[in-house]
């Protein structure tokens, strides 16, 4: 039996996240149905992680086992004939039978975009958080340094999740500005439920003067969700890369 690895990208605006849900349209269900039409058998489609409602992905990785003999290089073309315009498969390959798109991942990179100006943008409103109040990007950069390294990030997670450990390692966390767009770029070995969005919301609080950047290490070590910032809205978040 073959293990097929897919790379897809999607605009998450009109989906209730990645994971299949009983009464909602999800990315996983949509891709799974397209795959099954091609291979003509039931498959279990495994994803590299759960993205929430409204969150986007440029390089999402998933895999499935199949007895189909269709050449992997033809799969993207076949799948895209069945997928809607807001989901695209751009790569497929046969991979090792032990490959698991989630547990085999060693790092993930997310980007969060903030439109920081008075008026919203009709094009960017699906892909950024419009925040009209001034933000001090230098303070945000100072605070971002505190996240680097291995920490217990329980204070930067929403409730309603179950994991073996809440310790995660952040390899890099950069904040930069291009015109009216502030970008938060983070790479880690894994992320808790809503962790990146809470980091983004916290850095916005820092940039807006609600949190002192020099207090960030203490806030992380406190493991207190109440001391961190808000959970930033989903549309600004995009999964950029998964590393294996």
Task: Report each predicted region and the residues it spans.
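Structured-RNA-binding interfaces characteristic of tRNA pseudouridine synthases
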Residues: 1-244
């Amino acid at each position: 039996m073959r293990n097929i690895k897919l790379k897809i990208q999607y605009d998450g605006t009109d989906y209730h996240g990645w994971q299949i849900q009983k009464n909602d349209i999800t990315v996983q269900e949509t891709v799974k149905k397209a795959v099954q039409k091609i291979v003509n058998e039931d498959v279990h489609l495994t994803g590299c992680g759960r993205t929430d409602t409204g969150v986007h992905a440029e390089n999402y990785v998933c895999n499935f086992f199949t007895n189909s003999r269709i050449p992997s290089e033809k799969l993207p073309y076949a799948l895209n004939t069945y997928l809607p315009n807001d989901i695209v498969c751009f790569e497929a390959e046969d991979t090792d039978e032990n490959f698991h798109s989630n547990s085999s991942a060693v790092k993930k990179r997310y980007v969060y975009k903030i439109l920081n100006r008075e008026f919203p943008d009709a094009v960017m409103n699906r892909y950024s958080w419009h925040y009209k109040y001034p933000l001090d990007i230098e303070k945000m950069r100072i605070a971002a340094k505190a996240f680097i390294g291995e920490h217990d990030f329980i204070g930067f997670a929403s409730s309603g999740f179950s994991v073996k450990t809440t310790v995660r390692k952040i390899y890099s966390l950069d904040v930069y500005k291009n015109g009216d767009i502030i970008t938060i770029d983070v790479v880690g070995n894994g992320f808790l439920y809503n962790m990146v969005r809470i980091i983004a919301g916290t850095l916005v609080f820092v940039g807006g003067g609600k949190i002192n950047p020099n207090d960030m290490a203490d806030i992380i070590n406190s493991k207190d969700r109440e001391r961190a910032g808000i959970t930033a809205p989903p549309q600004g978040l995009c999964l950029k890369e998964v590393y294996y």
